A protein has these predicted regions:
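Secondary-structure boundary elements
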Residues: 91, 97-190, 201, 283-289
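Short, flexible loop/turn segments at beta-strand junctions in immunoglobulin-like
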Residues: 83-85, 335, 369-373, 459-462
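Residue-level detector of functionally pivotal "anchor" positions at catalytic/ligand-binding pockets or at interdomain
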Residues: 311-324, 399-427
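Intrinsically disordered, low-complexity N-terminal segments that are enriched in acidic
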Residues: 20-104
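Conserved aromatic anchor
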Residues: 327-339
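C-terminal outer-membrane/trafficking sorting elements
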Residues: 343-358, 373-383, 412-480
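Active-site neighborhood of thiol-dependent amide/isopeptide-bond enzymes
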Residues: 152-235, 249-252, 257-263
Length: 480
């Protein structure tokens, strides 16, 4: 008897960001028997689980059983001992599930206090450990660079993490697509690698200073692949860092950033899985599939093809500005799945002055934008918020713009018995059919004068300038 392990080649590349959204996904591997007299096959697919970046529900498997790899990883294993595909025939193992993916943007300014690590915690012990040649904190280059960056940071965890992120982006290149994870010595010698290998450099530098860090391994709904890194802050949680995105966009900020377009298939690297009961194999990266086959003839080949496709089932709509008034407008949106609140910042476009910052609860679907000046252009930055542990994250940022309307005036002829307000010769004229109270307001919001008007016509001279006249529910803009 012979058995042969083959793993899928990994294509890790970047692509444009998609909106936070939900998918119905089918993940499968098809084995085609080219010329074997097969006696047995064992096939493994990673099983995605819910975590801070995604919610996974409704898992269904074509065959096999789901097993726990560790606290944060699972896999589907099917051991096929009869009914093997004959030469030229195929066998497919598949899983289907629904997933909602969450973009994550973290404002580092919220971390005003950093706590020492609990060195006895499971997170600390697992994610500061070496892993053979793949995470090797004794590597001379890793030791030298980590010591230098640690000194530059003054021993501050966040400063050190950012320096590591910038160091990798500045000193290494994206190379060798489809190679999977290499030993750290190879990555350093080559001067880079694909996104998983670039993440490896960051993870090695973090673990060298006993800061918990790990790879995040994904497959996108279109079947492409990506890997980024996370590091951990005690009492706060995990922070995403996408070094490869920084290489693609050198002016972008991908520190505390997750695009939200990849289905996380596993976390960390170097996993030990049982391909048969009681028999274990350590694979470097669990992203697509592993498989083994046994055959009677002297030689033989079984080819494998992986396919993951997601059908989008829901996408959050873009926020919409309602009808604008001279003094404001309204903003509305469909609820964002997973959001724990919403924030809008309103600023004056011409000056950049922040006018207002409004926070709304998770069940809100609209907010008023009041107290704005007439005939003025404003920008609105709308952000759905999501609390992840003790970290406030934003699930994307939406930039909108509006221009407020002009204050209605009444300088035209109006039939007798109707309210009329007009300016002539530097004077204010008000004709009202009944007693009214009028407010003369300057454009900066200051009440210049309050008038108690009898029925009939009223007039007074006005200082030069522009004013808003409020009478009942009517408002008028006049220039003197």
């Amino acid at each position: 008897m012979r058995y042969l392990l083959l793993t899928a080649a990994l294509a890790m590349n970047m692509q444009t960001m998609v909106a936070q959204s939900s998918y119905q996904v089918k993940n499968s591997v098809t084995l085609r028997n080219e010329d074997c007299d097969l006696t047995k096959m064992s096939v493994i697919l990673p099983v995605p689980v819910s975590n801070i970046y995604q919610d996974v529900v409704g898992l269904k498997e074509s065959s096999g059983m789901v097993l726990d790899l560790d606290a944060s990883n699972r896999y589907l294993r099917d051991i096929k001992t009869d009914g093997q595909p004959s030469s030229g025939e195929s066998y497919t193992l598949s899983e289907e599930f629904s997933v909602t993916l969450y973009p994550v943007y973290i404002d580092m300014a919220q971390f005003t206090t950093l706590y020492p690590y609990d060195t006895e915690s499971a997170i600390y012990k697992r994610y500061t450990a070496d892993k053979g040649g793949y995470i090797d904190t004794s590597n001379p280059t890793i030791r030298s660079v980590s010591d230098r960056l640690w000194s530059e940071s003054g021993g501050e965890i966040l400063d050190y993490a950012r320096l590591c992120y910038e160091y990798v982006a500045a000193n290494f290149k994206y190379l060798y697509t489809d190679t999977g994870i290499s030993p750290i010595a190879t990555i350093l010698s080559d001067g880079g690698g694909d996104c998983g290998n670039l993440a490896s450099i960051f993870v090695n530098l973090m673990r060298a200073k006993k800061i918990p860090a790990k790879h995040i391994v994904t497959v996108r709904p279109d079947g492409s692949h990506h890997v980024w890194a996370d590091f951990y802050l005690e009492r706060c949680g995990w922070i995403p860092v996408d070094v490869n995105a920084r290489l693609v966009d050198p002016r972008g900020n991908y520190f505390g950033y997750c695009r939200g377009d990849g289905i996380i298939m596993s976390e960390d690297i170097c996993h030990e899985a049982e391909f048969l009961p009681g028999e274990k194999f350590e694979g470097v990266i669990l992203q697509t599939f592993w498989y083994w086959y046994w055959y009677r003839n002297a030689s033989g080949t079984v080819e494998a093809e992986h396919a993951l496709r997601g059908r989008q089932t829901d996408r959050v709509s873009i926020p919409v500005i309602g009808e604008t008034r001279y003094d404001g407008a309204s903003l509305s949106w469909n609820l964002f799945p997973g959001a724990t609140g919403y924030r809008a910042k309103v600023y004056e476009k011409a000056t950049g002055r922040l006018v207002d910052a409004i926070d709304m609860s998770a069940d809100a679907s609209s907010m008023p934008l009041d107290g704005l000046d007439p005939e003025t252009e404003y920008g609105i930055v709308f952000t759905p918020l999501r609390m992840v542990g003790n970290i406030e994250t934003s699930m994307g940022t939406y930039d909108l713009a509006l221009k407020t309307a002009a204050i209605p005036t009444a300088n035209e002829e109006i039939e007798a018995g109707e309210l009329r307000v007009w300016a002539a010769g530097g004077r204010l004229f008000i004709r009202t059919p009944e007693a009214e109270r009028a407010y003369i307001v300057t454009f900066d919001g200051r009440v210049y004068k309050t008038l108690s008007l009898p029925a009939g016509e009223y007039s007074e001279r006005m200082p030069q300038g522009s004013y808003i006249i409020h009478i009942g529910k009517q408002s008028y803009k006049l220039n003197f």
